[in-house]
Amino acid sequence: MKLLTGKVAIVTGAARGIGAAIALKLAAQGSHIAFTYVSDSSEEKANSLVAEIEKLGVKAKAYKANAADFAACENFVNDVVAHFGTVDICVNNAGISKDNLLLRMTP
């Protein structure tokens, strides 16, 4: 039996990079995956990741949602619970950067 069989994980910002790797590792351990992507240019990568995760024998669904928008996040979580029934794991991986230089960013 896999460690996370039957669990449901949310991974924000998972269309590529570290987020995609986290989603795949969780799926390999049996977790169903709900993940976000933010831009239209990431939609194809998100759909490819869904297919790759489903090959591991678990459910996956990609949601277009901006982690910087509270209402969008609230809607995302409500949609995940409606679709999967629960949330057991949350990995907040999405990066939010205005100009790539932390010292110049304002709260």
Where are each of the predicted segments found?
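Aromatic pocket-lining residues of Rossmann-like dinucleotide-binding sites
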Residues: 26
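Substrate-binding pocket helix/loop in short-chain dehydrogenase/reductase
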Residues: 101-102, 106
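The beta1-alpha1 cofactor-binding region of Rossmann-like NAD(H)/NADP(H)-dependent oxidoreductases
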Residues: 43, 63-76, 107
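Conserved glycine-rich cofactor-binding loop
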Residues: 8, 13-17
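A glycine-rich helix->loop->beta "capping" turn
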Residues: 56-59, 79-92, 98
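Conserved glycine-rich Rossmann-like NAD(P)H-binding loop of the short-chain dehydrogenase/reductase
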Residues: 31-47
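Active-site beta-alpha loop architecture of Rossmann-like, nucleotide-cofactor-dependent enzymes
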Residues: 17, 39, 97-100
